[in-house]
Every structure is written in C-alpha cells, then in structure tokens.
C-alpha cells in the first residue's frame, strides 16, 4: 500500500473519472442490507446516460440527461440538477463513482487513505469517517478508470464487464449483509 499524498491524489483522480470516455455493458452485483440483486446495465459516463434491468424480475430503470428524466416501470420522474448526484440507483453507482460515499466530502461515509496497484487494477483503501477501525476498498482498472468493485462491511458493488474462464479464485474473505450468499457463479 502506498500512502504518499502524490500517488494517492493521482489514483483518486483516475478513479473519479470512472472511465468517462467509455460506453459499456456489464453485469452489476449489489449486496447490502440483507439483499442481493443482479442487474444488466448499459452505461455511458461521458454522455451521463444509463439503463439497468433487474435480472430477478425484469424491472427497468433509465436516465435521460437531456430531459433530466428518470424512467422506471412505475413511470417517469423529472429531477432537478441538485437531486442528480444522490439519485443513482445501486445498480449503476460504479459507472458513476462520484455517486459513491467514498471521497471524503461532507456527505460521505468514507475517504481514501492509501492505494495499491496490482496488475491492471488500482485499489483505494477506504477508512470510515466516524469509526477509523472500519475499512473498505474501491477497485478500478488503472488504464481506463472503469470501476470494478466497492466493498465495505455493509455493502458490496461489483461490475463484471466480461466473463472470464478463470479469475484466479480471488477470495475477499467476507460479504456484506446476512442471511444470503452470492448467487451461484458469482464470486
């Protein structure tokens, strides 16, 4: 882990970019508060557009930045500019990293305190603002800035942009929530 302010600032800048120049489709895994959900998402961070389909029931959500309209199966909702930063559903938060509560802002629960580059990925070590004994992590592709995962003791977000025959059997040692485990085939 590197705690030098210069390297941490560079890593934070790359992470906040969130792959802004890249449009992609992915599978999004969200776990927390005793629930696990999987979504098929399409995201264009630079265009500020996204759509998500919950795999368990097929319900959909999407956002149109031209009209500031959130479309859901229940109908449309026009949003104000002030509402947008905290309006991203869990399914697309990794596509828009600034929506995560990890940057040390007044409204955030965590702040980055160290970074590590391993292979093609960079991981930010996060420390809880109120309880410095609680940690989390945020991992992104170093080159593109596209987020891959966000782990805290109470929440998990993970994006899978392509299926791989072998991911090396990575074991993070814990999963957030209680009473449920990850769906079969998701590590």
Regions found by a protein language model. Give the residues of each.
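Gly/Pro-enriched, hydrophobic low-complexity segments
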Residues: 53-59, 111-186
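N-terminal leader/targeting segments and the immediate start of mature chains
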Residues: 1-49, 55-57, 73-88, 105-117, ...
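Short amphipathic beta-strand/extended segments with alternating polar/hydrophobic composition
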Residues: 38-41, 60-66, 77-86, 137-140, ...
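A short, compositionally biased
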Residues: 20-21, 46, 64-66, 144
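Alpha-helical adaptor scaffolds
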Residues: 88, 95-96
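Metal/cofactor-centered catalytic core regions of large enzymes
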Residues: 102-106, 131
């Amino acid at each position: 882990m590197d705690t030098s302010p210069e390297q941490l600032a560079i890593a934070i800048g790359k992470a906040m970019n969130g792959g802004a120049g890249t449009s992609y489709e992915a599978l999004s895994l969200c776990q927390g508060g005793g629930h696990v959900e999987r979504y098929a998402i399409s995201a264009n961070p630079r265009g500020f557009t996204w759509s998500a389909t919950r795999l368990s029931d097929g319900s959909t959500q999407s956002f149109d930045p031209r009209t500031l309209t959130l479309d859901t199966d229940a109908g449309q909702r026009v949003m104000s500019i002030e509402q947008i930063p905290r309006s991203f559903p869990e399914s697309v938060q990794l596509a828009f990293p600034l929506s995560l509560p990890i940057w040390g802002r007044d409204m955030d629960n965590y702040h980055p305190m160290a970074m590590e580059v391993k292979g093609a990925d960079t991981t930010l070590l996060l420390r809880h603002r109120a309880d410095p004994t609680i940690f989390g992590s945020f991992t992104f592709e170093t080159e593109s800035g596209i987020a891959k995962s966000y782990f805290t003791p109470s929440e998990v977000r993970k994006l899978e942009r392509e299926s791989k025959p072998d991911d090396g059997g990575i074991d993070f040692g814990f999963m957030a929530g209680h009473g449920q485990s990850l769906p079969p085939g998701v590590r």
